[in-house]
């Protein structure tokens, strides 16, 4: 027996430890009283747990309205606009029947309208909304009450923002109320292809059902394509086309269908002015639009030629985010008026662009631009994920890390023994023998322990892959890796703002999402391949992890 170097009997030492532990339990200090109605934030400020921390965002409405609440009067011919406005503001939902009623009644009105609308001033023209319902309410504050103000919307009511169905239902309800003073055009996002790729289809299924989505798809095919305002301005979502010579070309389109990927209907929804519009080095009227992956860029010369031929003053369009909410392009030689104007009505687009939004008010031959900023809104995790689904990979990764850390705990003596067994020149491990296959043999049990440790390591790496997927922001993908810097999503809007500091940064980051997206089958295939590669990489890293190999070897031989 080894001596304990004069430190006394080991038994007495352990007895003293036990006595101390018992004494600590018997004379336990009383726990301090905690007021659970008060929570201290990271910055030291205190908030009440009995109230909402974000008072700018109202508590959600937990009920679905009765027909008495939904309809304006007993005739049941018009929805109650004021009720819907407040109900949607509180994230309230309608019954399936009520939502379908709004969409179908709106569809009847849209179907009866021509491809090319004609309206007189005064009117307020609005650009992209993109599911930003709370900013849409601000738009009506700035632009005027729809009961007293004439409105023309240029499309893109859905996708990217997480309140698209509320935007559709509210705008369609306004159309039912004011069919002759509120007009809705089609944007490139009002189609099956983009709504399936981005968020609108998922949103409809999450908040309502696929039947609501299908009703919206039918309704989108009924939206008019263009408008001539005050016999002076062509209003469209995208831009010009090599196939657009006169306004009759628009009137002759068969619009009741999914937009094609080329041709006049495609170009009206997808085309853009050249980036160096007005200072082009090319003499071509149209250049392939490599940014969108379809349609064209049109030149200053193309715009001037079209305006002169059709006796128009300017083209008013949407389709492109603008830092100031609008952009005036080079003036025409004949009228001195901007040949093209872009209006964008979604402020702080995607919660990261930091842009202003704008509407264009035209009255008494005077054109005014009204700008406005974003409004606080409820937060949704990407793809309408619930917090448990989103956070499980984080929890799983930490638990496996903790398990490995616990198993890695060892004394210096054990480490010395392990390094001795793995010293250079040591013999290679023996090949499995018949005895090693016996479940009762020591070798078999050791190998089983080793495999379990390695499996935990692989599991840890897999959770890491899943955690990285949870951090992926599906709407914003950086050019260099498909995701924002790790952790920015957990930091919420502030973290993303730090990662993307300017409008131009955000625009560059988001550029690939402005393209015509791949088909659903291609997306599924790419996602499956990415996941398989990530999991294969995770397994390979775990198998080559020296710390794990050392740990498994030490535990299996102890």
Swiss-Prot record:
Q: What is its EC number?
A: 3.1.3.16
* GO CC terms in record: calcineurin complex; cytoplasm
Keyword check for Iron, yes or no: yes
Q: Which chemical reaction does it catalyze?
A: O-phospho-L-seryl-[protein] + H2O = L-seryl-[protein] + phosphate; O-phospho-L-threonyl-[protein] + H2O = L-threonyl-[protein] + phosphate
Residue span of the signal peptide, if any?
none
Q: Which SUPFAM superfamilies match?
A: Metallo-dependent phosphatases (SSF56300)
Q: Where is Fe cation annotated to bind?
A: 128, 130, 156
Q: Where is the composition biased (Basic and acidic residues)?
A: 534-548
Active site at which residues? 189
Q: How does it assemble?
A: Composed of two components (A and B), the A component is the catalytic subunit and the B component confers calcium sensitivity.
Function statement: Calcium-dependent, calmodulin-stimulated protein phosphatase. This subunit may have a role in the calmodulin activation of calcineurin.
Q: Which family does it belong to?
A: Belongs to the PPP phosphatase family. PP-2B subfamily.
Q: What is this protein called?
A: Serine/threonine-protein phosphatase 2B catalytic subunit
- Biological source species: Neurospora crassa (strain ATCC 24698 / 74-OR23-1A / CBS 708.71 / DSM 1257 / FGSC 987)
| Taxonomic classification | Eukaryota, Fungi, Dikarya, Ascomycota, Pezizomycotina
